[in-house]
Amino acid sequence: MPQVTMRQMLEAGVHFGHQTRYWNPKMAPYIFGARGKIHIINLEKTVPLFNDAMNFLSSVAQKRGTVLFLGTKRSARESIKEEAERCNMPFMTQRWLGGTLTNFRTVKQSVARLKELEAAETDGTFDKLVKHEVLGLRREREKLDASLGGIKEMNRLPDAIFVIDIGHEDIAIKEAKKLGIPVIAVVDTNYDPALVDYAIPGNDDAIRAVQLYARAAADAVLEGKAAAPNSASVREEEFSAESADEGKGRRAPAKKGDKKADAAE
């Protein structure tokens, strides 16, 4: 598991919270104190929680699960997109569309439309249309790509969501909670850590801090993927199990009227 040290967190400014007047009392256990009316986050509490969260992400990836990277605030967009692409996971960096999770069937229809327009632009279909029609279709494609481009290969609901700012992404978190999707999130001093499954107390504004979180999350996913059994070994195990079952059937055929044997088969 890739480790992030306390020194790295200090250098990235993870320990700087929000102004003391904006604090959420439920963050009190993770606050070291205040400096110049700014809360200081206790990194001795953050590090183990951070490692727990990264271990969970790794375990999701090891089971071939999907992690949706989410960061639509300006300071998070670039890092979230870059790191999600590096570990080949879906992402959203523009405005969260209400119903992305809870109305996923409709979202998939919009994604299908995006793919249709992308294909039409490359297969020569656009060349057969008049200029104003092409412009209209390109605008539609650009709009869909901006909002859904990062999830166009996400064919089912994600197994977990990695979030940078829970206040900024509150609608997404509510949708995930409704569907029972685990949320791993950076929680600053002005929010309630109980709103998510894996809270990482830390600065959710500083670009360097966001880069650190996103890079570590991508590393955790990549490590989990590397530890996942490959398809060949999975098939070999299935074949061995099938052979064993067949052998058992030949050696000990069930007797008529033997309900236990019938159930075992």
UniProtKB/Swiss-Prot annotation:
Q: Where is this region: Disordered?
A: 226-265
Gene Ontology CC annotation, any one: cytosolic small ribosomal subunit
A biological process from GO: translation
Q: Does the keyword Magnesium apply?
A: no
| Source species, domain of life | Bacteria
Q: Which family does it belong to?
A: Belongs to the universal ribosomal protein uS2 family.
**Cited HAMAP family:** Ribosomal_uS2_B
Please state what the protein is called. Small ribosomal subunit protein uS2
What organism is listed for this UniProt entry? Xanthomonas euvesicatoria pv. vesicatoria (strain 85-10) (Xanthomonas campestris pv. vesicatoria)
